[in-house]
Regions:
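C-terminal, well-folded lobe of enzymatic/effector domains
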Residues: 79-171
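Betabetaalpha-Me/HNH-type nuclease active-site subdomain
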Residues: 1-83, 156-169
């Protein structure tokens, strides 16, 4: 088993912020024009080919349920999209999920190979690579110059260019 929270540099140092606590209906700061976005989609947890890796790493170290690690508020309306200049998050974003699943597949493949030699080191490396991927996805979603498009009805443009994201994930 890999070291858990607090025992290595990759472990979480702060209390998690649950997704349900961010932009929650009925709270003072709720904005109906914004939606919570999972950088690493929850779909990964139900994808059979990743089950061994995520079982080994654990949900908490990966940060699946922590908005600070794995979340971003994105506009859900055309008006909010125009105001914020961020990708619109309304409805499913299949292409984004496909690209992330592909990147996580590369991480899992490397983890599966490396764990035959040193299981703990393989886990630490996989966590590092998943964190790098989360960081790259966040940066890319926030980059106004090279925007990712999550929704085909996004008023700010269309198209996918994941070249830079590929380079960051492979580094």
């Amino acid at each position: 088993m890999i070291p858990r929270a607090g025992s290595n540099g990759l472990a979480q140092r702060r209390a998690i912020i649950p997704f349900r606590k961010v932009n929650a209906r009925g709270t003072a700061h709720y904005d109906p024009g914004l939606q919570r976005h999972h950088l690493l989609p929850r779909q990964l947890l139900s994808t059979e080919c990743f089950s061994k890796m995520f079982e080994h790493l654990g949900r908490r170290p990966v940060g699946f349920d922590d908005f600070r690690s794995n979340g971003l508020l994105l506009p859900a309306t055309e008006a909010a999209t125009q105001r914020l200049g961020l990708p619109m998050h309304r409805g499913p974003h299949r292409r984004y999920n496909e690209v992330v699943i592909e990147r996580v597949g590369r991480i899992e493949s490397r983890w599966a190979e490396a764990r035959t030699k040193t299981e703990d080191e393989a886990g630490i490396e996989a966590l590092m690579r998943l964190r790098l991927l989360q960081t790259a996805l966040r940066r890319r979603l926030l980059d106004e110059r090279k925007r990712l498009i999550l929704n085909r009805k996004d008023p700010l443009g269309a198209g996918f260019d994941f070249t830079e994201l590929d380079a960051m994930a492979e580094a």
